[in-house]
Amino acid sequence: MTVQLTAGAERPVVRLRAVAKNYDAGAVQVAALRGVSLEIPQNCFSMLVGPSGSGKTTLLNLIGCIDAPTEGTVEVCGEAIAAFGDNALSDFRARNIGFIFQNFSLVPVLSAYENVEYPLLLVGMAPAERRRRTLAMLDAVGLAAQARQRPNELSGGQKQRVAIARALVKQPQLVLADEPTANLDTATGASIIELMRRIQVELRTSFVFSTHDPHLMSHADETFTIRDGALVQPGLH
């Protein structure tokens, strides 16, 4: 069954059809995902919720073009991912998808400014535009005053704000956040979700974030509940 969460002519930013993902575990195969079909509309703040080991990260890796399904099809931003070669897929991912991780994944020897700027350096953006975008994103996440500080000088919440700015600085169509509040206290985690939500509305960027905390469901436009690798409770808030 395909879950179509919104009606309308706009193509979804993500479309999965009968997706399965198996991993080898010695002589046997372990099913991480089983028969997942879903559609996520554009300009949507979506959540994947489920316990640890339910398949959330595996699903994000498929949507993020980091891994390929064992069965089924994955379309992202209107493109069939299976049609890309390795180099084209890497370029597609760099242009269209931003990533936010629970452990922040910041470069420790770079300042907050340099961490946010780094993706723009990789694509060869002109210095003036690079500086404009970097400063604008740091301001958007409330870290203009901390631009020259390194990660070890920042709190956990500030590090995640840097990671959010870095994910958005290339103006991607889709941002994926894997347990973005897992290493934060409750109040800081709530502020990070609220920040992502505000930026999503302002920039009209699609967000998909995973969490094991069902209390965060109220922040999402749409939720998918995953258990034992299967989509068990799609819903619209």
Q: What are these model-derived regions, one by one?
A:
Residues 1-22, 233-237:
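ABC-family P-loop ATPase nucleotide-binding domain
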